[in-house]
Amino acid sequence: MLYGAIEAGGTKFVCAIGDEEMTIKERVSFPTTTPEETMPLVIDFFKQYQADLAGIGIGSFGPIDIHRDSATYGYITSTPKLAWQNFDFISTMKKEFPIPISWTTDVNAAAYGEYVFGSGKGLSSVVYYTIGTGVGGGALQEGRFIEGFSHPEMGHMLVVPHPKDDFAGSCPFHGNCLEGMAAGPAIENRLGKKGQEVAEDDPYWEIEASYIAQCAYNTTLMFSPDVIIFGGGVMKQRHMLQNVHDAFAKLVNGYVETPELSKYIVTPALEDNAGTLGCLALAREAVLHS
């Protein structure tokens, strides 16, 4: 028995096959161009394994419709990627693969991967953020995603501008939300160079850490999770995690007694495999509950 994973990202689709032990057997990627160009490549990849394919887990860029009783369940909805607006992802896959399919956001899939296999393994409540080209967040409680009328958009929480930061924010909707102030494009728009080109001792990192710490602070007060995981390219800066710990401690100011910060605010144990493994695990769950 095999399981399929689709990480549908804004720049590329990552497709993988895993076995019953959740070992990745093959993984490929395709550019995210248009449904007409990208989806045939995705379908052809899984066709090779169709005889043994039991279920597929999809984690997609969004916004997406997650309500099973909705007429547009399984759609990518109001995405800024015009070619993908109102694309019926689930039906497109179901036509070729009439098997159980799990459907969630790309960041939820990564959160689930960390919950099952990574930094959240064995814990009851996990919140995961990715800080890269954009900022997204997903939360789990006892293995269930925390969501209501839609999936959370945690990356767009408002943050208080740092006193040394006069940048107005790059989010076209909210300006100084977390994504607008801390995502990769915000760094580049502010400094004129990409985050990986900024020196480790540049004073800017104090500003960046303050926004990520505000995110952790807000998350702590709202959910008090067992762990907060920060992934994405920005968090690959070697010094960033300690900077966030320091800024977070100042914000909390002793008001909440959190777990030890080295175990409470962490980076992904699965690194770049979180999304793929999360999709595989969600595919397995879809089969078990079908």
Where are the predicted features?
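Short alpha-helix plus adjacent loop in nuclease-associated cores
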Residues: 92, 110-111
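Residue-level structural signal for beta-strand termini and adjacent loop
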Residues: 29-30, 82, 150-151
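Conserved NAD(P)H cofactor-binding loop of Rossmann-fold oxidoreductase domains
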Residues: 61
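Conserved A3 ("GATE") glycine/threonine-rich loop of ANL adenylate-forming enzymes
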Residues: 12, 109, 133-136
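Short loop/edge segments at beta-strand edges and connector loops
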Residues: 103-107
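A charged helix-plus-loop insertion that forms the helical arch/lid used to bind
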Residues: 70-85
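Glycine-rich phosphate-binding loop of actin/hexokinase-like ATP-binding domains
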Residues: 121-177
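ATP-binding/phosphotransfer module of carbohydrate and carboxylate kinases, centering on a glycine-rich
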Residues: 1-56, 64-72, 91-101, 116-125, ...
